[in-house]
């Protein structure tokens, strides 16, 4: 399971001209689900995403996690993160989970974020989405479990 996380001052996702999720300061999480992923990996990745200390403390050091910083989370499914790009000029998506399994794990991950009392907004699984964000820093990390 892969999360590309970006520290943002604001972010939103729109599907068919409808805003489905919008946050102020916090994390934009682009989530990719791979074939071998399960709830245990989703738990571990959620723990890492929410615990990752990439927000500035009073001294300006990256020392706070999203909850300590009072931030929110916007989770957007992105199957392209599971692409194999090692050969050729076209990515292969054979490493991605089947759509039904990927959706179940995506929803599980979102639920785990919400259980941690984090304001969690979402896109719409498998939809054509437009994501807008202001990357703060820029600060972007690739987390994989």
Swiss-Prot record:
Question: For the motif Gly-cisPro motif, important for rejection of L-amino acids, what are the positions?
Answer: 137-138
Class of the enzyme per the UniProt entry, highest EC level: hydrolase
Q: InterPro entries given for it? A: Daa-tRNA_deacyls_DTD, DTD-like_sf
Among the record's GO biological process terms, what is one? D-amino acid catabolic process
> Which reaction is the catalytic activity of this chain?
glycyl-tRNA(Ala) + H2O = tRNA(Ala) + glycine + H(+); a D-aminoacyl-tRNA + H2O = a tRNA + a D-alpha-amino acid + H(+)
GO molecular function annotations of the record: D-tyrosyl-tRNA(Tyr) deacylase activity; Gly-tRNA(Ala) deacylase activity; Ser(Gly)-tRNA(Ala) hydrolase activity; tRNA binding
Location comes to: Cytoplasm
A Pfam family annotated for this chain is Tyr_Deacylase
Q: What's the superkingdom here? A: Bacteria
According to its UniProt record, the EC number is: 3.1.1.96
Q: Which UniProt key words apply to this protein?
A: Cytoplasm, Hydrolase, RNA-binding, tRNA-binding
Please provide one cellular component term from the Gene Ontology annotations of this protein: cytoplasm
Q: Major location, coarse class?
A: cytoplasm
- Coiled coil feature spans: none
Q: Which family does it belong to?
A: Belongs to the DTD family.
Please describe what this protein does.
Answer: An aminoacyl-tRNA editing enzyme that deacylates mischarged D-aminoacyl-tRNAs. Also deacylates mischarged glycyl-tRNA(Ala), protecting cells against glycine mischarging by AlaRS. Acts via tRNA-based rather than protein-based catalysis; rejects L-amino acids rather than detecting D-amino acids in the active site. By recycling D-aminoacyl-tRNA to D-amino acids and free tRNA molecules, this enzyme counteracts the toxicity associated with the formation of D-aminoacyl-tRNA entities in vivo and helps enforce protein L-homochirality.
Mind telling me which HAMAP family this protein's record contains? Deacylase_Dtd (MF_00518)
Subunit arrangement? Answer: Homodimer.
**This protein's domain notes:** A Gly-cisPro motif from one monomer fits into the active site of the other monomer to allow specific chiral rejection of L-amino acids.
Protein's name according to its UniProt entry: D-aminoacyl-tRNA deacylase
Q: Species name for this entry? A: Salmonella arizonae (strain ATCC BAA-731 / CDC346-86 / RSK2980)
Q: Which gene encodes it?
A: dtd
């Amino acid at each position: 399971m892969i999360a590309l996380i970006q520290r943002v001052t604001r972010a939103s996702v729109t599907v068919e001209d409808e805003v489905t999720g919008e946050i102020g300061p916090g994390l934009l999480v682009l989530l990719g689900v791979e074939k071998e992923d399960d709830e245990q990996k989703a738990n571990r990745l959620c723990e890492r995403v929410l615990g990752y200390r990439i927000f500035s403390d009073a001294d300006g050091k990256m020392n706070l996690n999203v909850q300590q910083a009072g931030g929110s989370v916007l989770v957007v499914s992105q199957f392209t993160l599971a692409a194999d790009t090692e050969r050729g000029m076209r990515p292969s998506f054979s490493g991605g989970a089947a759509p039904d399994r990927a959706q179940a794990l995506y929803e599980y991950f979102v639920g785990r974020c919400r259980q941690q009392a984090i304001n969690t907004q979402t896109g719409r699984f498998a939809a054509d989405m437009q994501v807008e964000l202001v990357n703060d820093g820029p600060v972007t990390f690739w987390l994989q479990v």
